[in-house]
From Swiss-Prot:
Function in brief: Chromatin reader that recognizes dual histone modifications such as histone H3.1 dimethylated at 'Lys-36' and histone H4 acetylated at 'Lys-16' (H3.1K36me2-H4K16ac) and histone H3 methylated at 'Lys-4' and histone H4 acetylated at 'Lys-14' (H3K4me1-H3K14ac). May act as a transcriptional corepressor for KDM5D by recognizing the dual histone signature H3K4me1-H3K14ac. May also act as a transcriptional corepressor for KDM5C and EZH2.
Record domain Bromo: where: 145-252
Composition bias, Basic and acidic residues: 1-12, 585-597, 606-631, 656-696, 718-738, 1104-1116, 1154-1165, 1175-1186
Single annotated GO MF: zinc ion binding
Protein name listed in UniProt: MYND-type zinc finger-containing chromatin reader ZMYND8
Effect of residue 79 to A: Decreases interaction with histone H3K4me0
Induction statement: Induced by all-trans-retinoic acid (ATRA) (at protein level).
Annotated disease: Mutations in ZMYND8 may be the cause of syndromic intellectual disability with variable cardiovascular, ophthalmologic and minor skeletal anomalies.
One GO location term (cellular component): site of DNA damage
PROSITE patterns: BROMODOMAIN_2, PWWP, ZF_MYND_1, ZF_MYND_2, ZF_PHD_1, ZF_PHD_2
Region (Required for homodimerization): 875-1047
Region span, Required for recruitment to DNA damage sites and for interaction with the NuRD complex, CHD4, HDAC1, HDAC2 and KDM1A: 1028-1062
Length: 1186
């Protein structure tokens, strides 16, 4: 432990305090308050002056009372420069010593390898933890949850998290480490931390975000690894504590209100809707039926679902989620009580939402889940145009807890003041995520960047604020404003129908994708401006506001082309951007809107041609109808155009407001909404400004309006409407009817003069469909769709004139389609060329419309055939192009069979005569320039490919270098891990060896003790028994004091050896003396008996009694085996013992014999012998059993 190189002289603390006085903010317990690192004073939440006022108190709080007592072990200033006494000694990542980088804001240090840095950074350096906390606490980049919470509320939630971290077994981390028990703790641990300290800091409101709290909590694990080692039991517990902390912080970030409710666990806490309610879904887990749940968030194609009932949670694949409908997506045969209780709880939740927000909508059956679905469930079904129910943002949510919507989101104040449109500043409100894409850009690239920032940082806020934006910005006054700023500041872009789509886009596409949408939008809007402005210039009519937009267009053309191409290259798109944001979106609202807007262009154009009749009212009606395309879209398919016209007239201002919701009601896909919004901004204000002006420049199929035709049916099939319709007919052949309906709907609002009886217009639309195969040719096919709509007279006009759909208009239509389908690929020269052709066609159109000669029906049919031939010619002449959709977008001629005079048909036929020639010329021009455009596009693509390959090479080299650094770091970590494991294993082996030895010694001692005990017992048992002196078996017979035998053979075998020491031989003389005494007495008695024969028996009896007495004595003494026979063997002695007894018996009878003397002498001898050596076996060999 090279602590000597880490520590410094005692004055270092004061020096560093002076050094860090100003750059260092007041410390939270982890040594920093990272929000102060931001340069803007607005972002600071604590003043740096606090450091000076209570520096000692703060330090004691951070380091404990013993921090300043920590003295350096040596005064060797080896590592004074990198280590200045205010930083830790151990790397924050690997928890080891070494050459480290010190953070300027906190005590943490890092190895350069652990940070994957090739070289040490210059100047002040801030560690990743501090950067993370700074980002999390900065007002502009803080998370959605942090924008909703104040510091007090966050501190309140952190207290719950700390309580959950106090799990059983974490007692060691709940209080500071007692230095009395661990006096060396301060030598290793620079920054002590425990749960009690965390709780105190939370009470003091020292944490501005969850990241700061988590970073502080990680000190517990860091210190534990340093002091106890990475494999210690306490370290495992510390890891569990940190995992719990990470989980709790993550839950707070997901939804603070849900977290609080889950912690407080009130009655029906799961049924309380949040201020921004979570969508309800049917979610399915494997092995379970579809279950009602809240969708809190979605990530990587998975939905974080919280289920009703048991309140379980799970990540469910997004394709297994359906929006909440009244019926379960896939019915279950038998429902269990658990499911029923979950459904009841969900119904309570729905009621609470209705009580809080006033509305809740069940989605249609099996509607797939998409993000931001809460807006669909909050749509008012009775008044869909009103948008979503207003979500409370101003009120603080009172959940026994002050949870506010962030004060930064001041959405409720009106965005527009008065009737004039002004640019909405970022300071007033964070932009809706769609705002960057939807507004018509006036060239402020800086502002667009700022808006992009706003979309990312205020994602959630803008979601919540969509309804405000909708209601405040969609006012008719703002749309009608004639100032230049109204184009950019027109509030239409902020309609809520766009908020949902763009939020998904921002989540799921890269920034290049958003740039692409931005540029497509801008280019489209400028194309509209070009067409309108040129048409106005051609008619030489006063245009108040077109010229500024014209300048904007010319200023941005080159930049836009470059940007579009670069975006296309970045996204790897070989085909048209239509697929990016239009064709992919199977949308009818786009087409409807396009047709509506183009209707108004045709209307104002035709009305301008009828200058003799100042029908300004109709022109205004056209503009009004123009303002409300979505309202038109929403209405049911019309069968009476006049009614629609009146309806449009009467409801135009109101439906202006309603039209954002209109698109939503149709539940059109999000990209469709996106595009419909894009379609709105530029056409509306310009058309308002161009009221009464000519709009023949509009590159759509214009319809010849006679000056006296008031109620005639305007059949609009042009521009993008027809082009998109072609694409849509290809992708969604089932959906032509909405477009046709719109075509039938919109014209009536542009009636001009005469009264005509009701007639049935037959709309024949030949819409071209563009198909881009790879990067190659566009093939177009003509499809005719006939829509018949009964059109009663608007004002009872006797004759309704037919306006033929002029085929010569196909070229302008093509031009518009070309722009929208390949806007990324065109250069300025191509654009200007197309506009030039457009002007020529418009001039021809005006001439033909003024002529309007009569023609025959057959000629009209021939004209259509010619037009079709021209289309085929265009297709064949256009070489494989991936960028230009050479489609005569809509060749439609409405055949209106009139119940009135035939003059209408004749005039329309005559009007068609010069048209075929014009169309052929246009086709020739298009074919002529196709190759040139393709060459330019090929060159551009080659350059893009080269640039991309270069960039790829550079990035590959950088990637290789990064991977090498990564490999080195991993190798170093591997070596460190191996060395640590080796060291730990050696320690473990030593401990195991020592323990085994101790165990062996212990066992040996125990065994010895046991064996000694058993030996003693065996000895004792052995001593209790007599053993044979010859064979060592257990003895039965006793010879003398130390000699016993198991049997007679052993006695005989052992006798030669034992004879010398036998104790019985020592007692033999005494026995002989006793025998002599007995013999003498016997002799005396025998002599006395001889005198009297009567006394003999009695004497004999007395003698025998004496013998018995002596025998008993010898029996009692039992201590000797009389072996006094001089040299006789024991066997003879033993044999003689039995004979002796027989002799004694015979001697008893011998006294009765006559030969008394001889018998007495023999008996005396025998008696002495028997007493001497021939005792009975019982007397001679005593048996001793235990």
């Amino acid at each position: 432990m090279d602590i000597s190189t880490r520590s410094k002289d005692p004055g270092s603390a004061e020096r560093t305090a002076q050094k860090r006085k100003f750059p260092s903010p007041p410390h939270s317990s982890n040594g920093h308050s990272p929000q102060d690192t931001s340069t803007s004073p607005i972002k600071k939440k604590k003043k740096p002056g606090l450091l000076n006022s209570n520096n000692k108190e703060q330090s004691e709080l951070r380091h404990g009372p013993f921090y300043y007592m920590k003295q350096p072990l040596t005064t060797d200033p080896v590592d004074v420069v990198p280590q200045d006494g205010r930083n830790d000694f151990y790397c924050w990542v690997c928890h080891r010593e070494g050459q480290v980088l010190c953070c300027e804001l906190c005590p943490r240090v890092y190895h350069a390898k652990c940070l994957r840095l090739t070289s040490e950074p210059e100047g002040d350096w801030f560690c990743p933890e501090c950067e993370k906390i700074t980002v999390a606490e900065c007002i502009e980049t803080q998370s959605k949850a942090m924008t909703m919470l104040t510091i007090e509320q966050l501190s309140y939630l952190l207290k719950f998290a700390i309580q959950k971290m106090k799990q059983p077994g974490t007692d060691a981390f709940q209080k500071p480490v007692p230095l009395e028990q661990h006096p060396d703790y301060a030598e290793y641990i620079f920054h002590p931390m425990d749960l009690c300290t965390l709780e105190k800091n939370a009470k003091k409101k020292m944490y501005g975000c969850t990241e700061a709290f988590l970073a502080d909590a990680k000190w517990i694990l860091h210190n534990c690894i340093i002091y106890n080692g990475g494999n210690h039991k306490l370290t495992q517990i510390a890891k569990v504590v940190i995992k719990i902390c990470e989980h709790e912080m993550n839950e707070i970030e997901v939804c603070p209100e849900c977290y609080l409710a889950a912690c407080q666990k009130r009655d029906n806490w799961f049924c309380e809707p949040c201020s921004n309610p979570h969508p309800l879904v049917w979610a399915k887990l494997k092995g379970f039926p579809f279950w009602p749940a809240k969708a809190l968030r979605d990530k990587d194609g998975q939905v974080d679902a919280r289920f009703f009932g048991q309140h379980d949670r799970a990540w469910v694949p997004i394709n297994n989620c359906y929006l909440m409908s009244k019926e379960i997506p896939f019915s279950v045969k038998k429902t269990k009580s658990i499911f029923n209780s979950a459904m009841q709880e969900m119904e309570v939740y729905v009621e609470n939402i209705r009580r809080k927000f006033g509305v809740f909508n069940y989605s249609p059956f099996r509607t797939p889940y998409t993000p931001n679905s809460q807006y669909q469930m909050l749509l008012d079904p009775t008044n869909p145009s009103a948008g979503t129910a207003k979500i409370d943002k101003q009120e603080k949510v009172k959940l026994n807890f002050d949870m506010t919507a962030s004060p930064k989101i001041l959405m409720s104040k009106p965005v527009l003041s008065g009737g004039t449109g002004r640019r909405i500043s970022l300071s007033d409100m964070p932009r809706s995520p769609m705002s960057t894409n939807s507004s018509v850009h006036t060239g402020s690239d800086v502002e667009q960047d700022a808006e992009k920032k706003a979309t990312s940082s205020h994602f959630s806020a803008s979601e919540e604020s969509m309804d405000f934006l909708d209601k405040s910005t969609a006012s008719p006054a703002s749309t009608k404003t004639g100032q230049a700023g109204s184009l950019s500041g027109s509030p239409k872009p902020f309609s809520p129908q766009l908020s949902a789509p763009i939020t998904t886009k921002t989540d799921k596409t890269s920034t290049t994708g958003s740039i692409l949408n931005l540029n497509l939008d801008r280019s489209k809007a400028e194309m509209d401006l070009k067409e309108l402005s040129e048409s106005v210039q051609q008619q030489s009519t006063p245009v108040p506001l077109i010229s500024p937009k014209r300048q904007i267009r010319s200023r941005f053309q080159l930049n836009l082309d470059k940007t579009i191409e670069s975006c296309k290259a970045q996204l790897g798109i070989n085909e048209i951007s239509e697929d990016v944001y239009t064709a992919v979106e199977h949308s009818d609202s786009e087409d409807s809107e396009k047709s509506d807007s183009s209707d108004s262009e045709y209307i104002s154009d035709d009305e301008q041609k009828s200058k003799n009749e100042p029908e300004d009212t109709e022109d205004k009606e056209g503009c009004q109808m123009d303002k409300e395309p979505s309202a038109v879209k929403k209405k049911p398919k019309p069968t009476n155009p006049v009614e629609i016209k009146e309806e449009l007239k009467s409801t135009s201002p109101a439906s202006e407001k309603a039209d954002p919701g209109a698109v939503k009601d149709k539940a059109s896909p999000e990209p469709e909404k996106d595009f419909s919004e894009k379609a709105k901004p530029s056409p509306h204000p310009i058309k308002d400004k161009l009221k009464g002006k000519d709009e023949t420049d509009s590159p759509t199929v214009h319809l010849g309006l006679d000056s006296d035709s008031e109620s005639e049916l305007v059949i609009d099939l042009g521009e993008d409407h027809s082009g998109r319709e072609g694409r849509k007919n290809k992708k969604e052949p089932k959906e032509p009817s909405p477009k046709q309906d719109v075509v039938g709907k919109t014209p009536p609002s542009t009636t001009v003069g005469s009264h005509s009886p009701p007639e049935t217009p037959v709309l024949t639309r030949s819409s071209a469909q563009t198909s881009a195969a790879g990067a190659t040719a566009t093939t177009s096919t003509s499809s005719t769709v006939t829509v018949t709509a009964p059109a009663p007279a608007a004002t009872g006009s006797p004759v309704k004139k037919q306006r033929p759909l002029l085929p010569k208009e196909t070229a302008p239509a093509v031009q518009r389609v070309v722009w929208n389908s390949s806007s990324k690929f065109q250069t300025s020269s191509q654009k200007w060329h197309m506009q030039k052709m457009q002007r020529q066609q418009q001039q021809q159109q005006q001439q033909n419309q003024q002529q309007q000669p009569q023609s025959s029906q057959g000629t009209r049919y021939q004209t259509r055939q010619a037009v079709k031939a021209v289309q085929q010619k265009e297709i064949t002449q256009s070489p494989s192009t991936s960028t230009i959709t050479l489609v005569t977008s809509t060749q439609s001629s409405p055949l209106v069979t009139s119940s009135g005079s035939m003059s209408t048909l004749v005039s329309s036929v005559n009007a068609d005569l010069p048209i075929a020639t014009a169309s052929a010329d246009v086709a020739a021009d298009i074919a002529k320039y196709t190759s040139k455009m393709m060459d330019a596009i090929k060159g551009t693509m080659t350059e893009i490919y080269n640039d991309l390959s270069k960039n790829t090479t550079g990035s590959t080299i950088a990637e290789i270098r990064r991977l090498r650094i990564e490999i080195e770091k991993l190798q170093w970590l591997h070596q460190q891990e191996l060395s640590e494991m080796k060291h730990n294993l050696e320690l473990t082996m030593a401990e195991m060896r020592q323990s085994l030895e101790q165990e062996r010694d212990r066992l040996i001692a125990e065994v010895k003790k046991q064996l000694e005990l058993e030996k003693q017992q065996a000895v004792d048992e052995t001593k209790k028994k007599q053993w044979c002196a010859n064979c060592k078996k257990e003895a039965i017979f006793y010879c003398c004091w130390n000699t016993s035998y198991c049997d007679y053979p052993c006695q005989q075998a052992h006798w030669p050896e034992h004879m010398k020491s036998c104790t019985q031989s020592a007692t033999a003389p005494q026995q002989e003396a006793d025998a002599e005494v007995n013999t003498e007495t016997l002799n005396k008695s025998s002599q006395g008996s001889s005198s009297s024969t009567q006394s003999a028996p009695s004497e004999t009896a007395s003698a025998s009694k004496e013998k018995e007495t002596s025998a008993e004595k010898s029996k009692e003494s039992g201590s000797t085996l009389d072996l006094s026979g001089s040299r006789e063997t024991p066997s003879s002695i033993l044999l003689g013992s039995n004979q002796g007894s027989d002799h004694s018996r015979s001697n008893k009878s011998s006294w009765s014999s006559s030969d008394e003397k001889r018998g007495s002498t023999r008996s005396d001898h025998n008696t002495s012998t028997s007493t001497k050596s021939l005792l009975p076996k019982e007397s001679r060999l005593d048996t001793f059993w235990d």
